[in-house]
């Protein structure tokens, strides 16, 4: 099934200037980057986006990291894009991520783990709308 998913290239990817390499992994997997933009999250935006994790011990460090520098948000499209991208990202903890995955090949640690990807169709819709307006998405149809 043709799906869209949200991808975030986190501040560590932008800071280390490896966005092109990560994008190559995405495109070589068969996923299409249909739109992307660079932005700098405010603390409020980061807290809102990750609100589901508010009660977790990693919430504050995650928010701190996500506001530490620019990010790149992307809409990816392809057959079974959500599960394909999650497989391509690799395990959250790069020590457990397989070689050939984004985190396995590029992530420095569990906090600076390079990427975020939607984990379900419902979350993909919500997360894409969080970063992209209807106007921005209209031209993608």
Swiss-Prot record:
GO MF annotations, alphabetized: ATP binding; metal ion binding; nucleoside diphosphate kinase activity
Cystine connections: none
Transmembrane stretches, start-end: none
GO CC terms: cytoplasm
Main subcellular location of this protein, as a coarse class: cytoplasm
Coiled coil, from the record: none
Catalytic activity: a 2'-deoxyribonucleoside 5'-diphosphate + ATP = a 2'-deoxyribonucleoside 5'-triphosphate + ADP; a ribonucleoside 5'-diphosphate + ATP = a ribonucleoside 5'-triphosphate + ADP
One Pfam family from the record: NDK
CDD domains: NDPk_I
Domain of life, source organism: Bacteria
InterPro entries reported in the protein's UniProt record: NDK-like_dom, NDK-like_dom_sf, Nucleoside_diP_kinase, Nucleoside_diP_kinase_AS
Signal sequence extent: none
Cofactor: Mg(2+)
Residues at the catalytic site: 116 (pros-phosphohistidine intermediate)
Subunit (UniProt): Homotetramer.
HAMAP family, A to Z: NDP_kinase
Protein location: Cytoplasm
Family per similarity comment: Belongs to the NDK family.
Organism the protein comes from: Ehrlichia canis (strain Jake)
Gene Ontology biological process terms in this record: CTP biosynthetic process; GTP biosynthetic process; UTP biosynthetic process
UniProt name for this protein: Nucleoside diphosphate kinase
Name of the gene encoding the protein in the UniProt record: ndk
